[in-house]
């Protein structure tokens, strides 16, 4: 576990925003979420932080979102999880916050394309020329930002996720020459998001 730097004040937006995406603060994030999950219902913590973290779920190969969602998925039906399960939720949220990384562009959902059409406008990258971590260089990739911004507003979150997973499953099948792990995550992360939808404000979608 990384050493703590200094506590994150969850009520101070300037402070916690400066720590988003800073993995060296992962332990600080963990302590913040542990504290909040002791003081508040876990559903309320997700409702508060979900809209903040969703735009940056791409970071850490989407593992923050996936870990958080699967922690919730394993909660008992009476929604009264054990201390160990609550701590796993805190760890998932902390990893998500520490690896927070939004995609380039401003996906304000004012575009006109569904996800499958937007995919057709994405530029192609030679896997052999990819350097650095996954996603490195996307800001400078011609056409990528405009493709992200071309997405239309989703009127139904569940349907939008289904469209997304189906579209990227098609990409995975159509391109066996591409390393599969990144593409698999474009399917598994949105699918995992289904577990959090009941606690995310609908206006986010």
Which functions belong to the PLM regions below?
Residues 1-205:
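Mature, well-folded catalytic/scaffold domains that follow N-terminal targeting or propeptide regions
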């Amino acid at each position: 576990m990384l050493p703590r730097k200094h506590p994150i004040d969850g009520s101070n937006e300037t402070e916690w925003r400066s720590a988003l995406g800073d993995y060296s603060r992962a332990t600080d994030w963990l302590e913040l979420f542990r504290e909040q999950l002791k003081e508040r219902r876990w559903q309320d913590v997700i409702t508060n932080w979900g809209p903040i973290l969703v735009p940056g779920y791409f970071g850490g190969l989407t593992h923050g979102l996936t870990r958080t969602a699967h922690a919730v998925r394993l909660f008992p039906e009476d929604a009264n999880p054990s201390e160990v399960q609550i701590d796993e939720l805190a760890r998932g949220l902390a990893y998500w916050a520490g690896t927070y990384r939004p995609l380039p562009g401003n996906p304000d959902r004012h575009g006109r394309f569904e996800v499958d059409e937007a995919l057709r406008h994405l530029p192609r990258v030679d896997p052999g020329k990819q350097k650095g971590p996954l996603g490195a260089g996307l800001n400078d990739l011609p056409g990528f930002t405009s493709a992200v911004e071309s997405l239309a507003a989703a009127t139904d979150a569940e349907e939008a996720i289904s469209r997304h997973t189906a579209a990227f499953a098609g990409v995975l099948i159509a391109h066996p020459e591409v390393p599969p792990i990144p593409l698999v995550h474009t399917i598994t992360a949105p699918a995992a998001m289904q577990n959090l939808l009941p606690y995310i404000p609908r206006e986010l979608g």
